[in-house]
Design a protein with these regions (language model features):
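Membrane-interface transmembrane helices that cradle and orient dolichyl/undecaprenyl
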Residues: 90-108, 143-147, 565
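C-terminal luminal/periplasmic domains and tails of membrane-associated envelope-modifying transferases
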Residues: 350-632
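Short helix- or helix-capping micro-motifs
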Residues: 60-65, 92, 116, 120
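Short acidic/glycine- and proline-prone juxtamembrane loop motifs at membrane-interface regions
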Residues: 75-82
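Specific aromatic-rich, kink-prone transmembrane helix
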Residues: 83-100, 111-115, 264, 291-298
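Transmembrane-lumen/periplasm boundary regions of multi-pass, lipid-linked membrane glycan transferases
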Residues: 1-8, 14-21, 118, 122, ...
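Cytosolic-side transmembrane helix boundary signature
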Residues: 142-150, 294-319
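Transmembrane-helix motifs of polytopic, lipid-linked glycan transferases
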Residues: 31-51, 89-93
Length: 632
């Protein structure tokens, strides 16, 4: 990443005397991003004007402005919105250069230079634009030459000269705003593109109701996310191009339309070829969406012209478009704090996406949660010190007011590990939660729920209060080996909060310490009822089944878990143990080797391996495991 946006934003904040802990800093950044978003809407409208007419320009601007995902990100996203601004601005100016290719205007060349450089300074994908724009330009030029057969058209060499200035200038400008790239501009830009193609971070994401790794998403990930989160008017506009294809391309300017179409489709081709890691829906491809909006507007303009040709009322086309835009507009008005949490009617709105797709993946609702704690008198200048735990620490920490910030100890914890530490209040964002758990308990159904943050009545985050301390005391007693106390506390917790799957798991673990595996199993089954994909619950369920001699059920549960969590050393270990107990030594050997590959310092894995290979009569591999164990 470069500093195309961060540098001017930081300089302006410094001039205004804003520090990192000031709320005003975040307001300033929101305003600057909104300005870039407004210019992006303007660019979309201008492209629509050059592809059709002023009505087409209005259609494009309307669709983009009332796109909840785009509008929401235009206030919060310091990477994808600046990049979309640079990308669409570059598309506009390259279309203008192509339109006036015989004598390009200097203002268009300068505009392309600035937008290309700005996009490159924000994200290395700007370098990809250099190649893509050449491809798009040649596509438009080739079509123009083919259709007109005009000897007046410039040769490819002249085109290279025309584009050489903005391309070279844009590259230099972009690198100047990217301090890291100044060391070795060419190689570092290429390196960053390679990193994007094979993104090294793999996080858990919710897609189609299943937890996946961002590095292993299917090819349907991007088209699915786009189709269920854009306004229906956008989809309809693209579909309208099909029946009115001849009208659109006959009316022209055909070469400009082809050029923009290449810019629109090329990113999809890149994703299919490079297969990069994807997460957070399509926010990384906001530039792709904004490029497609003028094309969708072309479809609506062609439909409106067809209506007029039929001598029907000329307002029918705009009214139909307007009616389709009512639904996203109402969503924006109702949820102006976080309009980007939007799903269209194809998936049943936000309620249909609940537990199936990530909702507030940016964690914006932490602001509303902090402000709710202020309204309820929890956070104020004269408050007593508290511990506030959250799974989105940055958003919470940076919205605490200065007058009480030093009295709030903000701690990070995963939602599934929320009882590993003591806390007074908690703010939980639904991101990274198991969708099956959210739907099973109708999250947040906890007795500790103090206030849910909702979008169209669907919760996206929740404030918890500590409430009764049963589960905290029970977990502490379990960890310290005070089993009878743990059982008492956890039984009280389940009476207080029946759907607390962690309490059921802890109680099962406590009862298992007494040797009552039947009762322990019942608690693990209840835990899985409320959290079917909880790894620890699955493993404890399998342990209980193994101890009861039901190896087939244990293996089935572990195999299903390992399909999603293939790096679970515990899963592989108990799968090996189940097969070992059942006498399936070959499979046990295979799984125990996988165990120590996943976690090489796991002593029980090496110990079980010794037993397996000794029973197989394979003393050589038993000695290898024995030697490795001695080195730990």
């Amino acid at each position: 990443y470069g500093a195309g946006y961060e540098l001017p934003a930081g300089m302006l904040a410094s001039i205004l005397g804003l520090e990192d802990e000031d709320r005003g800093l975040h307001v300033l950044r929101n305003i600057l991003l909104a300005i870039l978003g407004a210019f992006t809407v303007l660019f979309a409208g201008l492209i629509g004007r050059h592809l059709s007419n002023w009505r087409g320009a209005f259609f494009a601007a309307l669709i983009l402005f009332l796109s909840p995902r785009f509008l929401g990100h235009s206030f919060i996203n310091p990477r994808d919105i600046p990049f979309a601004f640079g990308f669409l601005g570059s598309a506009l100016f390259i279309l203008l250069i192509l339109k006036n290719f015989e004598k390009p205007r200097w203002r268009d060349i300068i505009g392309l230079t600035f937008c290309l450089g700005f996009a490159l300074s924000v994200r290395s994908g700007g370098a990809l634009m250099l190649y893509m724009f050449f491809l798009a330009f040649y596509a438009g030029l080739f079509f123009l030459q083919f259709v007109t057969k005009s000897p007046k058209l410039p040769k490819i060499g002249n085109v290279l000269k025309t584009l050489g200035i903005p391309v070279a200038g844009g590259f230099i400008f972009g690198v100047l705003l990217w301090p890291y790239a100044l060391k070795d501009p060419i190689n570092i830009v290429l390196e960053s593109l390679a990193v994007f193609s094979e993104y090294p971070v793999s996080i858990r994401i919710l897609f189609g109701g299943e937890l996946l790794r961002s590095s292993d998403v299917p090819l349907t990930y991007l088209p699915t996310w786009i189709s269920i989160t854009v306004p229906l008017a956008f989809i309809a506009g693209l579909l309208l191009i099909v029946p009115y294809f001849k009208r659109i391309f006959a009316n022209g300017p055909t070469y400009l339309i082809i050029c923009l179409t290449v810019m629109f489709l090329a990113p999809f081709g890149y994703v299919l070829l490079s297969d990069p890691g994807l997460y957070d829906g399509w926010r990384h491809f906001t530039f792709f969406y904004v490029t497609g909006v003028p094309l969708a507007a072309l479809g609506w303009e062609a439909f409106s012209q067809w209506v007029e040709d039929k001598n029907w009322k000329p307002w029918i086309g705009p009214v139909v478009l307007g009616l389709l835009m009512v639904e996203p507009a109402v969503h924006i008005a109702r949820n102006y704090q976080y309009p980007y949490v939007y799903f269209n009617p194809l998936v049943g709105g936000v309620s249909g996406a609940f537990g199936n797709y990530e909702l507030d993946y940016w964690g914006i609702s932490t602001r509303q949660a902090v402000e709710e704690l202020e309204r309820q008198g929890v956070l104020h200048a004269d408050m007593e010190p508290i511990v506030l735990v959250t799974n989105f620490r940055y958003g919470v920490q940076n919205w605490l007011a200065p007058e009480y910030r030093d009295k709030v100890e903000v701690e990070y914890a995963r939602y599934r590990e929320r009882y590993e530490l003591e806390w007074d209040y908690a703010i939980w964002i639904s991101r990274f939660m198991d969708g099956t758990h959210m739907k099973a308990v109708d999250w947040p159904s906890s007795t500790r729920t103090m206030h849910p943050i909702t979008v169209n009545s669907t919760p996206i985050s929740a404030i918890y209060k500590k409430g009764e301390p049963h589960v905290f005391e029970g977990k502490k007693a379990l960890d310290e080996g005070r089993i009878e106390e743990a059982i008492e506390h956890l039984n009280n917790e389940i009476e207080y909060n029946p759907k607390n799957y962690l309490a059921h798991r802890f109680l099962g673990m406590s009862v298992a310490r007494t040797g009552d595996w039947e009762t322990a199993l019942s608690h693990f089954e209840t835990s899985l009822k409320y959290a079917p994909e909880d790894q620890a619950a699955v493993i404890n369920y399998a342990i209980a089944k193994i101890n009861l001699g039901d190896y087939s059920d244990a293996k089935l549960a572990l195999h299903e878990m390992l399909e999603t969590f293939s790096n679970s050393h515990g899963g592989w270990y108990y799968l090996a143990l189940a097969n070992f107990r059942e006498g399936e030594l070959s499979l046990a050997a295979q799984y125990i080797q996988r165990t120590v590959q996943v976690r090489q310092d796991f002593r029980p894995g090496w110990q079980l391996g010794i037993q397996i290979f000794e029973q197989m009569g394979d003393e050589q591999r038993a000695d290898l495991f024995r030697n490795r164990l001695e080195q730990l």
